[in-house]
Amino acid sequence: MASYKVTLKTPDGDNVITVPDDEYILDVAEEEGLDLPYSCRAGACSTCAGKLVSGPAPDEDQSFLDDDQIQAGYILTCVAYPTGDCVIETHKEEALY
């Protein structure tokens, strides 16, 4: 099992967490005490949306996001597994629309 360094750029500053490749980014962020937005925890809404700044795109169920949003780098942290070290801007739900 691999683990990756995920930098979360929140309104309160940058936080670096280590996320195993078989755990959701949101779940590990919560375990580390970070307060990130979420609602459904199933990839069926956009409350937890983030935007990939750098690094490989996480492996996720992107069924809620449309092709343009995916191309723009948006992800849903509640259903995203890291595939490498990456930087993600959090709190991006409003930017989706």
UniProtKB/Swiss-Prot annotation:
Record-linked SUPFAM superfamilies: 2Fe-2S ferredoxin-like
UniProt keyword terms in alphabetical order: 2Fe-2S, Electron transport, Iron, Iron-sulfur, Metal-binding, Transport
Cofactor binding, per record: Binds 1 [2Fe-2S] cluster.
Keyword check for Ion transport: no
One Gene Ontology molecular-function label: electron transfer activity
Matches recorded under Pfam families: Fer2
Location of the 2Fe-2S ferredoxin-type domain: 4-94
Cofactor(s), by name: [2Fe-2S] cluster
Top-level division of the source organism's lineage: Bacteria
GO BP annotations listed: electron transport chain
Annotated residues for binding of [2Fe-2S] cluster: 40, 45, 48, 78
Purpose: Ferredoxins are iron-sulfur proteins that transfer electrons in a wide variety of metabolic reactions.
PANTHER family on file: FERREDOXIN, FERREDOXIN-2, CHLOROPLASTIC
Family statement: Belongs to the 2Fe2S plant-type ferredoxin family.
Entry protein name: Ferredoxin-1
Organism: Aphanothece sacrum
Lineage: Bacteria, Bacillati, Cyanobacteriota, Cyanophyceae, Oscillatoriophycideae
